[in-house]
Amino acid sequence: MLESEVSKQITTPLAAPAFPRGPYRFHNREYLNIIYRTDLDALRKIVPEPLELDGAYVRFEMMAMPDTTGLGSYTECGQAIPVKYNEVKGDYLHMMYLDNEPAIAVGRESSAYPKKFGYPKLFVDSDALVGALKYGALPVVTATMGYKHEPLDLKEAYTQIARPNFMLKIIQGYDGKPRICELICAENTDITIHGAWTGSARLQLFSHALAPLADLPVLEIVSASHILTDLTLGTPKVVHDYLSVK
């Protein structure tokens, strides 16, 4: 391979890259979202400045993605924390777990999604929508919601899916010193809502040292939604460079 061609490659291994080029379009992406109130002091310890908390809330989200351009079929879950940045409201992505190596690789390399490997599932059990996460062999999350009990306004569903996502991008140099340390923002685009519902929900978080979702305890369930949508991942943008701060 010519030297001039090396920088044109997307990632390694060159003969079989870990992921293809985007854009990444999701068809029939299915969400189970549960918003809950948690401990404010716990949130203050983990949400990085210059983001500001927008209440003492967390959104647990479970997403089944059966048809993703270039990445195939997989399931993902995690915690998102409502925040504000320069008066723009969005969500800080705290941690994410999924069962697809290309999606993990592209999320971490090409963007800043805090992704780790886990075993999430979203399924219907009798008349309940269930989201479950295992890390290794151990259960970490069980989320339940009544299956399509009440319709949710489609505009409200769109608003939930269209919120900006904030993430940290941290890469060390070969000397162990920070090489990249940035706050990133990305938004979903080309959103089509196919259906949306709400209803009663419950959420159990189990302590795990390497999947510490339970460090943000469930104090009160605020709301829940079940949304079917198509969308495209937007291009991430740097909104704050921590290494430029003196």
From Swiss-Prot:
EC category: lyase
MF annotations from Gene Ontology: acetoacetate decarboxylase activity
Keyword Hydrolase attached: no
Catalytic activity field: acetoacetate + H(+) = acetone + CO2
Top-level division of the source organism's lineage: Bacteria
Active site, renumbered: K115 (schiff-base intermediate with acetoacetate)
Keywords for this protein: Decarboxylase, Lyase, Schiff base
Keyword Lyase: yes
EC number(s) stated in the UniProt entry for this protein: 4.1.1.4
Stored InterPro entries: Acetoacetate_decarboxylase (IPR010451), Acetoacetate_decarboxylase_bac (IPR023653), ADC_dom_sf (IPR023375)
UniProt xrefs under HAMAP family: ADC
Family the UniProt entry places it in: Belongs to the ADC family.
Role played: Catalyzes the conversion of acetoacetate to acetone and carbon dioxide.
Name under which the protein is recorded: Acetoacetate decarboxylase
Annotated organism of origin: Clostridium beijerinckii (Clostridium MP)
Primary gene name: adc
